Amino acid sequence: MSDDNDKPRTRKPLGLKRSVDAGEVKQTFSHGRTNKVAVEVKRKRKLLKPGETPAPAPEPAPEPAPAPAPAPAAKKPAPKKPAPAAETPQERVARLQREAEEERLKLAEDARKRDDQKAKQNADDEKKRQEENKKAEEEAEKQAAAEAEAAAAAEAAPEEDADDGRKAPVARKFTPVARPEPKRPEKKKEEKKPARGGAKDKRRSGKLTVSKALNEDEGRRAMSLAKLKRAREKERRLKGGGSSAPREKQVRDVIVPEAITVGELAKRMGEKGADLVKELFNLDMMVTVNQTIDQDTAELLVEQFGHNIQKVSEADVDIQAEEDVDPEETLQPRPPVVTIMGHVDHGKTSLLDALRGTNVTKGEAGGITQHIGSYQVNTKSGGKVTFLDTPGHAAFSEMRQRGANVTDIVVLVVAADDGVMPQTIEAIKHTKAAGVPMIVAINKCDKPEADPDNIRNRLLEHEIIVEKLSGDVQDVEISATKKTGLDELLEKIELQAELLELKARPDRMAEATVIEAQLDKGRGPVATVLITRGTLKRGDTFVVGTESGRVRAVVNDQGKQIKEAGPSMPVEVLGLGGVPGAGDQLTVVENEQRAREVAEYRQEKATEKRTALAPTSFDTMFNNLQSNVIEWPVLVKADVQGSVEAIVTALHNISNDEIKVRVLHAGVGAITESDVTLAAASNAPIIGFNVRPNAKARELVKRDDVRMMYYDVIYHLTDEVAKEMAGELGPERIETVVGRADVKEVFKSGKKDKAAGLLVTDGVIRKGLFARLTRDDVIVSATTIASLRRFKDDVDEVRSGLECGVVLEDTNDIQPGDSLEVFEVEERERTL
């Protein structure tokens, strides 16, 4: 051990130094509990490089020499008091907070004193500048006055000096001006900083950032756009007129519809809404700005404020095609539109098949036409003719009328072996009402019983005089099956078209007439239209009736899609919003907004018309209440709009005073679930014309046991419905009077009944027949003969001129002088 102590040491021995200052803190809790916690303050360890000596401790800096005039803010803070030895952490925190608050208050007081001193200095400088400016202005005024006096003296000098040519120059004084820009101080005055209070508020308003310091107006309320406009307008008025006089009132042309709100009217007039409300209050009308007023009240307000009114009605929203007339120089020739009309089964469709080289009649139910067909045929001369094939059945009167209204020429087909029939006469009336020329085509001339001359003579009864009888109506004998006379017919059609000079403008937005409309299962609503003017293109926006849409596809009569269709061309249009009515006008408009606007207006008008109550009287109401008319409810669904119209018209024609048809719903397209539900709730049958129910509707039909009636020929439908309605009424009762008698005496018969002694005046009276007892030609009772006796013997009948006694069933109201009428009742099957 001693050897170890004697060895020289090259390194210091390892040991622990005290690197922290330790202490204790006493914690006090509730209920007298305390706790002592050891607290250590760790000192930062300094690492030295090998061979480097630690830096000596910094000596306290010597106190600087006092400045000659130290600023108050440059004073050194007072030395901090040393912390007490036995100070707790809570006391230390409180002491530090108190010292920080005192320091903050002291700094704030120093800043306030600096601001006061700066503001005082600025005020002194401003006062000094104002005095200098005032002095400079006074000197300038004195100089101007001296110059004016010198100029006046020069003018008043004697003229002799002027003759000598030696005019003495006016002495001019140059007074130095103190400030070359006297208005500069005013500019500085405008840029003066806010007052002391404002600066103080800004300083205390929140944290000061660099952006806030650069943008002094940050946070202030910005001037509104209206206020800025008013300020600029005022400045412009002051510059222009030099006065703040009110400007002249501007008179406006105010467009006023049938109903308008007060606020909207104020905007259009350029007035304040409150002024209009005050004026209405003066007129004893308590309204608000958002309240609607009528056109007459708006007119009073517009005139009161000195404006001009322009009245417009809601009808102006609708399209008025009559007002849009094309200039004469824009019109170009167009193909004629020819409608083939005549009685059913006179060969109209067969004639069109012969012209087109097709066979349409084979595909038609019952061999009759029930839709309007539209086709275009090329002639030998290179022209085109558009044909419309109309139904000849009586139920399709509206279709024939539509065909006559859109056509240029009517070809009246009359069968040479049948003659002039009811629908032939109706077609003549439609043609005359439409005011279009007519060509008579006498068909079936190949039959041996054909008599064309008889047809011409029969047409004279209806004021149709053909050319062979020295008239002006062209006629031609044809045979559709043998295809004879067809070329002559086409020549006559072209000749008539040349006389009419048919023209239309192709380079404009299209207008067309709906010939037929239907709801196709795969293509949706489809309308067959005839272009009257313009060109219909794919993508055009249009409105038709109460529906609007966009042309999705244009299909010609051969089933091919085309890009556009010109005047007199029949096409199918896809892309409608709904099924339009046949005969509606299709008009192409600028955009979808315009189309929707017109369609909505028309829908509102249609709803008003549908829901409007018809004018009635008390007599009509009481008659309806007392009448025992039976209603036969029914739903009608068909493939096209024209068939729906024809079926509804035919059903109403079947109705009479005892029973009438009530059509609950009539529409186009397949039978749907809603149709079946409505029929089940109303206990009504569904008539399907060339349509069938879908899968879900068939399930509902089976579940609710709804009666379905399917037809494809219209006269089969009307016959069946007539039988159904007759069955609802029951058999028809036919009364036959067999005898009459007069009551001579009345006797008692048993305890309750009365017997009447009769004298038979006419016919015979039989036991068990129906009888009517009348008194003064008024029926007292209608009953039957319960008992018939003659001289106390029961008999079956009593003939005229004999006396008898009768007992009537369920009546004792018999008096001498009454009359008895005996009759038989026969029940027959009722027909409508």
UniProtKB/Swiss-Prot annotation:
Segments for region (G4): 443-446
Residue spans of biased composition, Low complexity class: 145-156
Keyword Transmembrane (UniProt): no
Database matches in InterPro entries: EF-G-like_DII (IPR053905), IF2_assoc_dom_bac (IPR013575), IF2_II (IPR044145), IF2_N (IPR006847), P-loop_NTPase (IPR027417), Small_GTP-bd (IPR005225), T_Tr_GTP-bd_dom (IPR000795), TF_IF2_bacterial-like (IPR000178)
GO molecular function: GTP binding; GTPase activity; translation initiation factor activity
Subcellular location: Cytoplasm
Stretches the record annotates as G3: 389-392
Keywords, comma-separated and alphabetical: Cytoplasm, GTP-binding, Initiation factor, Nucleotide-binding, Protein biosynthesis
Bias-annotated ranges (Basic and acidic residues): 89-144, 180-200
PANTHER family, per the entry: TR-TYPE G DOMAIN-CONTAINING PROTEIN, TRANSLATION INITIATION FACTOR IF-2-RELATED
Family listed: Belongs to the TRAFAC class translation factor GTPase superfamily. Classic translation factor GTPase family. IF-2 subfamily.
The protein's name: Translation initiation factor IF-2
Species this protein is from: Erythrobacter litoralis (strain HTCC2594)
Lineage of source species: Bacteria, Pseudomonadati, Pseudomonadota, Alphaproteobacteria, Sphingomonadales
